[in-house]
């Protein structure tokens, strides 16, 4: 995805509403968006079996980047594939694994998000992890999925600072509970509407089903709330 607009971000990396020492989310402040109820965590992890982990890379004045990993379930994603689809709207990106998602409609790996120039490093590490899972010893073709945004305004993107150890750490930290949001993982260096962007998540429950989303916000324009 292209970098956000060139207007300087108007919020520091660690700014935001807080309740005590805990960073507050909208519903913590009594703000309820929409009519449908959310799940227990108001997160993508309210979908049964889904877990999320982050690894953040920071170096004062130089690096604000990282990787976020979404595990579709706790089993072997290659052996227990899931139905999947892909829609691209009003943008372009460097999404690894897009063709098989479109053509076969199956997900057979975890999904990772990172910075644009880290995509292939993360994909290589994610493939190593997948091939090393028990039961995958004879796998000769696998489709990992890695998305990205350009965090080059707040990080030295050419450093390609996310490596295999960060992917491993993100997977190891993946939890099916509350999801850490904001300037963390793949959201560490993002900018949105001229403000600090980050990782966001939510869920809604309808008719006995749970819909969960996770976003890596990084785009330009002006936000007008009327």
Regions found by a protein language model. Give the residues of each.
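Alpha/propeptide regions of enzymes that mature by internal proteolysis
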Residues: 2, 6-226
